[in-house]
Amino acid sequence: MGALCSSETYMLDKEEYKKQVEHNKSIENDLEKDRKIKILKLLILGPGESGKSTTIKQIKIIHDEGYSAEEKMVRKHGIYMNILEGIEEIHLSVGRENKSYKNPLSFDHINEVRMFTENFKKADDSEKLLGPEVINAIQKYIKDETIAMMLRDKTVYNIDDSTIYFLENFSRIIQKDYLPTEEDILKSRVPTSGVIQYKIMLKNFNFRIFDVGGQRAQRRKWLHVFDDVQAVLFITSLSEYDQVLREDATVNRMKESLNLFEKICNGRYFLNTAMILFLNKIDLFKIKIKHTNITVALTSYKGPQECDSALDYIRKRFISLNKNKKRSIYEHVTCATDTEQIQVVIDSVIDVVIQHTMQKVGIQ
C-alpha cells in the first residue's frame, strides 16, 4: 500500500509540476506581451497647417488635464503673435489680389503693426503685451472697406481661419486680464519644428504621440526614426485644394498631400503599420466648395460642384493610393477644432492602435 501511495503521489506531483511549468510559461508569455505593448507609439504626419498640432491639443484637453494657468499665459504671447502675423498676411493678400485700400491711412496702420511686430519678437515674455498704439492701428486697419470685405469672404481670399477667429474676439483678447480659453488655444498656430513628443496614458496604455514638422525638410530628416510605431495618423486639409505650399509656391497643397500620403502608405518604414486618415477642415471645405471647384487641383474630377460628391472623390483618391490591399485605411472626416466631434474620432483612433498592437503580439 505504501508503495502504491508513493507512486500515486509521484504521479500527482508530476502532473502538478507540469501544470506549474505551463502556468509559469503562460505568465512569462503574458509578461513578454505586456512588455511589447508597454508603450504604444502613434506618429502624426501630414503637410504643414493641416491640423496635426490641433489634434494633439484636443487629446490633451479631452484625455489629460488640459492647460494650466501657467501654460495659458505662455500661449497668450503666441496668440498675440498670431494676430500680428495675420494682419501682415492680410496686407500681402491685398497685393496678391490686386485690391486697393479705401482708406489712405491704412498704409500707416500696417506700418505701425509691422514696426511693433519687429520689437515684439525681440522682447522678453514679460514685456510681450499689445500696447494701445498697435491696438488702435489694428482696429482702424480692419475697418477699411477692402479689408472688411476680404474678411467676410475669407475662403475666397484664403485668409487663415485662426486670424478671422482672433480678430472677431479682438476686444476680449486685448483686455489686461486676458487668459486664453481652450478654444483660443485650439485656434492658435505654432509651427512645429523637428519632432514634438507627447506622453499620455490612454485606456490603461502608455502612449507616445509624435508630431513631425509638416514642411518637407522636417519630414525627410525624421521619418526613418519611426519604423517601430504602431500606427500612423495622416492628417490632410480638405479646404486647401486651391492653395500652394508656404515653402514652395509652385506646388498645390492638395497634390502635395496626395503625394506624401502615397509615400508614407507604401514606404518601407510603415509596411506593417496601422494607417489612419483624417480628412480635416470639413467645415471650411463646405464653404469653399460653393465658389471654387476641386478641379483647380484635381482635373480628373467630373462630378458636380457640391460637398458630398467632391468629398467622396477626394476620399477615394487617397484610399486608392494604398498598394497594400491586405491593410485597411481607417478614415475619418473631421473638424479638429470641434472638441465634441473630435472626441469620438480620437477614441476610435485609440481603439485602432490598441487592437492593431494586440493582434501583432498575439493577444487577439
UniProtKB/Swiss-Prot annotation:
Keyword Protein biosynthesis recorded:
no
**Which GO cellular component term is one of those annotated?**
heterotrimeric G-protein complex
- Region G2 motif: which residues? 184-192
Disulphide-bridged cysteine pairs: none
What Pfam family does this protein match (any one)?
G-alpha
Ranges for domain G-alpha come to 38-364
Q: Where on this chain does GTP bind?
A: 46-53, 186-192, 211-215, 280-283, 336
Q: Which parts of the sequence are annotated with region: G4 motif?
A: 276-283
- List every stretch annotated G3 motif: 207-216
Q: Annotated region G5 motif: where?
A: 334-339
Q: Which UniProt keywords apply?
A: GTP-binding, Lipoprotein, Magnesium, Metal-binding, Myristate, Nucleotide-binding, Palmitate, Transducer
Which annotated residues bind Mg(2+)? Answer: S53, T192
Cite the SUPFAM superfamilies for this sequence.
Answer: P-loop containing nucleoside triphosphate hydrolases (SSF52540), Transducin (alpha subunit), insertion domain (SSF47895)
GO terms for molecular function, please?
G protein-coupled receptor binding; G-protein beta/gamma-subunit complex binding; GTP binding; GTPase activity; metal ion binding
Q: Where are the N-myristoyl glycine lipid anchors?
A: G2
Region described as G1 motif = 41-54
Instruction: Summarize the subunit comment.
Output: G proteins are composed of 3 units; alpha, beta and gamma. The alpha chain contains the guanine nucleotide binding site.
Q: What does this protein do?
A: Guanine nucleotide-binding proteins (G proteins) are involved as modulators or transducers in various transmembrane signaling systems.
Protein family membership: Belongs to the G-alpha family.
Q: Give the protein's recorded name.
A: Guanine nucleotide-binding protein alpha-8 subunit
Which species does this protein come from? Caenorhabditis elegans
Q: Which gene encodes it?
A: gpa-8
